[in-house]
Amino acid sequence: MMFLRIIQDIALMSSVGVVLAFVMVIAQRWLSNYGELTININSKKDLTVTGGSSLLSSLGEKQIFIPSACGGRGSCGACKCKVNEGGGPLLPTEKPYLSKSEIESNVRLACQVKVKSDIKIEIPDSIFNIRRFHSEIVEIIDYTYDIKGITFKLLNGETIDFKAGQYVQLETQPYAKVKQSVMRAYSISSKPEINDSIQLIIRLVPEGICTTWVHNHLKQGDKVNFTGPYGDFYLRDTDADILFVAGGSGKAPIKSMLEHLKVVGTQRKMSYFFGARTTKDLYLTEEMQSYEKHFQDFHYIPVLSHPEADDNWEGRTGFVMPYFKEAIRDPKNTEAYLCGSPGMIAGVTKSLVEDYGLSADKIYYDSFG
């Protein structure tokens, strides 16, 4: 009898557990069903969206693309916009990317804000110029053991207008164990005067979802979508001397700028410091040397931090900063364009301001990592 009673109790508890689980599923579905909601943009435009998704993805579904270098993972802080009503409380995941003044001005990260009620936001008008493009891969070049150059030919008569230095967000396709598409940001390396195709330079990042797809799965003839152009890192139209500093795939936007300057026939004094570990990490050297012949006053200076014995390297070594003294003629008439890791950007910026007297507002950079 006791054994039978135990069996009955277990059956009863199991039934209760099933009922509770069912109720929780129904409740979760009911609570997460926010229905149709309105996103008001700049007090001018209303969008009707299905609630429950992030503000970033909700806008993307309506072909409004806010910059997001990390693809909405909350790790880049690029998708900032003002949320004046309906955004809910500021999340701990947002605070590291927002200054005190930004928080006081209702700035939020669009990827962290969930659309759970009608919401009012402010975004720059330039965002409306960002589009989704369709392309075909027409060329893949191995620049080094871990860097490729890829050419995307636009389809359906599409053209793209961008400034030298800007970037696009590449949409991956599912592959292997990666079942969903992701978006990652890459700088355009081609000149803006060619508007029916773009070139990107992409370095393989270990276990990187997008770079693994590009290096191991992407092939000529594949169809690929991307959005853009994005970014405030672009060449300023002045007569100031230029100091370029980059490393690795950071050569991409600098190459775009140099190609553009070649087209317009600039007379500006330019120096380009390219940081690498060994000679295996140097690429497009002949093209850089061709710029030295083309421009009236351009110098390409590669600097190796860890040259190997068999490199037979006779050039500059160590950090790039000590060599800036060769290039900076007039700090008050010099602009710097930096592209590389956050650590490199911070170190170079500090040196330019403290050691060489450049104004911080004349230092432009594209930080990735």
For the regions a protein language model found, what residue spans apply to each?
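Short cysteine clusters
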Residues: 70, 76-79, 111
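Fe-S ferredoxin-like electron-transfer domains
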Residues: 19-26, 30, 96-153, 158
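Ferredoxin-reductase
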Residues: 132-222, 276-278, 303-306
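Short, conserved phosphate/pyrophosphate- and ester-handling motifs at nucleotide-, phospho-/glycolipid
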Residues: 165, 250, 341
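Residue-level marker of beta-strand positions
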Residues: 78, 120, 167, 222-223
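A short, basic/flexible loop-to-alpha-helix module at the beginning of a structural domain
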Residues: 227-240
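Reductase modules of NAD(P)H-dependent flavoproteins
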Residues: 2-72, 83-105, 273-369
